[in-house]
Regions:
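Transmembrane alpha-helix boundary and packing residues in multipass membrane permease domains
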Residues: 21, 25, 37, 41, ...
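Transmembrane helical elements of multi-pass membrane transporters/channels
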Residues: 16-35, 137, 171, 200-204, ...
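N-terminal transmembrane alpha-helices
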Residues: 6-43, 56-71, 75, 79, ...
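Small-residue-rich hydrophobic transmembrane alpha-helices
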Residues: 48-108, 145-163, 271-335, 367-389
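Short runs within selected transmembrane alpha-helices of multi-pass transporters and secretion channels
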Residues: 69, 137-156, 167-175, 193-206, ...
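Helix-terminus/linker motif at the lipid-water interface of multi-pass membrane proteins
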Residues: 30-48, 118-125, 181-188, 247-277, ...
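Hydrophobic transmembrane alpha-helices of multi-pass small-molecule transporters
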Residues: 60-63, 175-180, 205-209, 280-284, ...
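Short alpha-helical transmembrane segments in multi-pass integral membrane proteins
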Residues: 1-18, 76-143, 185-240, 297-363, ...
Length: 443
């Protein structure tokens, strides 16, 4: 049964509506996880470290797609809630076209930036060569990956979250199968892992382009449009929190790698990469929920339905709290098998990964609330507060903590830094929620 944005959402309906977005985000995160798993076990530790070292740069660039997707879908959903369907499709079309053209230009520039960025991150010798090789291959599909990030949000706004899920599942399975074929069977090494990801990203980005470009049964369709400078600026402002989250994460991940190189060498970077893979999957649950529920919030905000805003906010906080505790418990239980799966071939690296993940996992108790808080304000078209939460969470607090805490606790200080930064951010998020309760009437 099709669920519409205008409906009243029970727990069952809310979970049914956001579930495809959660799975979409999980499969998106699997791209890099599967690459890392095969590279670590079939190519070697140095190539594995190279993937982890250059990935923050690539993810930071692709974050522009998340910015346009989340910021633009909030505007489009609000416009639909106001009953302006034709105008909503104009905005949607403009944003997709800008992403496609901009993505091609950015991909070409990124080809030349991979080498200096890898050097900046501390790569040299064989590690540098692997970073350049893998990074330039992934630049090929950068426009498609940016479009995929845009369409993840717009599939939900179009009331087609299940179609979006199917696209991402097909893309993810393609990546996994080709990783196995290229790396494990044909022994193409690091290039094989890179091209497997490229193929998956092309499917995830181009299929939605064809779907929305033709006559379809959704609320949205690509067509003729005009340049709306104010809407583009509002999209960038509104989605700046998501851009800040991804860009800052890339900067912070690079800083973590530098600190780990200092305290644990190449093993530290490899251990951090393994931990990040699980972090991507766990946190993607919260990001998926935020993406899936945001258009509902935007729609009812546009329709001035305060009772439904309260209903959505209260249910969301309870769901996130339940997932937070569950993920923390799961993380503690899987620390040993996780380390065995990725780095069981090296006892020292195994111990470093296992102990590091158990300390890192305390962040899962908190980060879901901060992710939702930022996305909630984006959905309410308050890009400033959303961006401020993301800026403090992903850049200011994390940089400060990861630079200072290791001076006191050594390598354990690196693993604990994220949880401390999330706790500091939660204080800020909670303050904004209380201060703005009378403005948006969600409490």
């Amino acid at each position: 049964m099709k669920i519409q944005l205008s409906e009243h959402f029970t727990y069952k309906k809310l979970l049914q509506f956001v579930f495809p977005s959660i799975i979409m985000m999980i499969f998106t995160s699997i791209y890099s996880v599967v690459d890392g798993l095969f590279v670590s076990n079939f190519v070697g530790k140095s190539a594995f470290a190279a993937v982890n070292l250059i990935m923050p740069f690539l993810m930071g660039i692709s974050a522009l797609g998340f910015m346009i997707g989340t910021g633009g879908s909030a505007i489009v959903a609000k416009t639909l809630g106001e009953g302006k369907t034709e105008k909503a499709n104009e905005y949607f079309s403009m944003l997709v076209y800008i992403t496609a053209i901009g993505g091609i230009i950015i991909a070409i520039l990124s080809m030349f930036l991979v080498k200096p960025v890898a050097i900046l991150f501390g790569a040299n010798g064989a590690l540098l060569d692997n970073c350049i090789l893998y990074g330039r291959i992934l630049c090929i599909s950068l426009p498609a990956f940016m479009l995929q990030n845009v369409f993840q949000s717009f599939f939900v706004t179009a009331e087609k979250p299940h179609l979006g899920l199917r696209v991402i599942v097909i893309a993810g399975v393609t990546n996994m199968v080709l990783d196995f074929l290229f790396v494990a069977v044909l022994h193409f090494g690091l290039p094989g892992a890179g091209f497997a990801t490229v193929c998956g990203e092309f499917i995830g980005g181009l299929f939605p382009l064809f779907y929305f470009g033709r006559k379809n049964s959704s609320l949205l369709k690509l067509g003729k449009t005009h340049f709306h400078g104010r809407i583009l600026l509002k999209t960038c402002t509104n989605g700046s929190s998501e851009l800040m989250t991804n860009l800052s994460s890339s900067v912070v991940n690079a800083l973590y790698n530098m600190q780990l190189m200092k305290f644990a060498g190449e093993d530290g970077v490899a251990a951090y990469g393994t931990i990040m893979y699980v972090n991507f999957i766990f946190v993607s649950i919260f990001f998926g929920y935020a993406i899936g529920s945001a258009p509902i919030v935007s729609y009812h905000y546009g329709a001035n339905n305060q009772d439904e805003l309260k209903n959505l906010f209260h249910k969301s906080i309870r769901l996130i709290g339940t997932w937070a505790v569950s993920l923390f418990i799961i993380a503690q239980l899987i620390a040993t098998p996780l380390a065995t799966l990725f780095v069981g071939y090296d006892q020292g690296l195994f111990e470093l990964t296992r102990s590091g993940f158990r300390l890192y996992s305390f962040a899962f108790l908190i980060n879901g609330f901060n992710i939702y808080g930022s996305a909630f304000f984006t959905a309410l078209n308050n890009g400033l507060l959303s961006a401020l939460i993301s800026f403090l969470r992903t850049l200011v607090f994390q940089m400060a903590v990861v630079l200072l805490l290791p001076l006191l606790l050594g390598i354990n200080g690196v693993w604990c830094s994220v949880a401390i930064a999330e706790l500091l951010t939660l204080c800020v998020t909670g303050t904004f929620i209380v201060l703005k309760r009378n403005t948006y009437h969600y409490l």
